[in-house]
């Protein structure tokens, strides 16, 4: 019997040019991936031009804005952008909102208030998509008698929130339709986050909730080669995303505890990586099993099933290495061999282009 698998999607990072995104979008649609999630952080490539180009190039694959932060995209602008992209794509947009990376938001010269920012953004965006005239006074963002001057194609467009800390996860359950679990979060953390979100959603009487997990992935016929590629990807993410210094946010301490990696080991690994040592020499297999999918296609599928067991409905995979389209196609073919009747989590052609 085939394993219970999550949906498989692609995450397109900001290191990719719009032209590269278009090529990957065509490949993803041809091989049946569910969604293209476009990642945006301050000061990298803005995602909206690539999303628009990919919307025009494709007809089935969904397009995830994952994520827009309200400090750079005011909530009124998020509603405008999401609605117009939904028009362009024929209703294929999936909206993700997050508070952004604290250190980078600080560079904008604005006060970082993640809970307030998420709350205000969801309230304003929902009202505008419903074609309401929104007057809202928030702690971070406000709107005064604002209405879209056109009707959004889907007034009930689902909203996913990127959240990590416990209070943000609880907020996500109360207000949103889905959670985006960030990179560098092991399965045990995902299980814990899912429990917090679903408990909060139940209290708010929200019945359905979608869990999307971001993960780097390396799938190759040579499993050892794939694991080395994955180490380089995880190493780059640790350098970019893990806080410097010793004063780590509580959620990072929780992630570390649930990964099985001791704090001194992580501190030592970060120091060596930041001094330029190659990740293949620094990181052992625990960093790969905790923070990536890696190996042959069959091994990656087994690892993906583990995330499904802890509550992830969808994996948005960043394919590491020099040939992401080929590696993604290799994995897709293996999934289709495993579930040959076409009823597979990876296939979008049998379902309508709604939120997923």
Question: Residue ranges of each PLM-predicted region?
Answer:
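N-terminal beta1-alpha1-beta2 module of alpha/beta enzyme domains
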Residues: 1-65, 157, 348-350
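An alpha-helical appendage that flanks or caps ligand/catalytic pockets
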Residues: 2, 111-148, 190, 199-309, ...
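Hydrophobic faces of well-ordered beta-strands that scaffold small-molecule active sites
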Residues: 6-12, 36-38, 63-66, 93-97, ...
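Active-site mouth loops of central-metabolism enzymes
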Residues: 6-19, 68-76, 153-164, 217-220, ...
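Short, acidic/polar
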Residues: 16-28, 78-81, 161-171, 230-233, ...
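Conserved, mostly hydrophobic/aromatic
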Residues: 28, 32, 54, 85, ...
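Glycine-rich, proline-tolerant flexible connector loops at the mouths of alpha/beta enzymes
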Residues: 35-57, 69, 101, 105, ...
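Alpha-helix-loop-beta-strand connector modules within alpha/beta enzyme cores
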Residues: 45-68, 72, 121-124, 128, ...
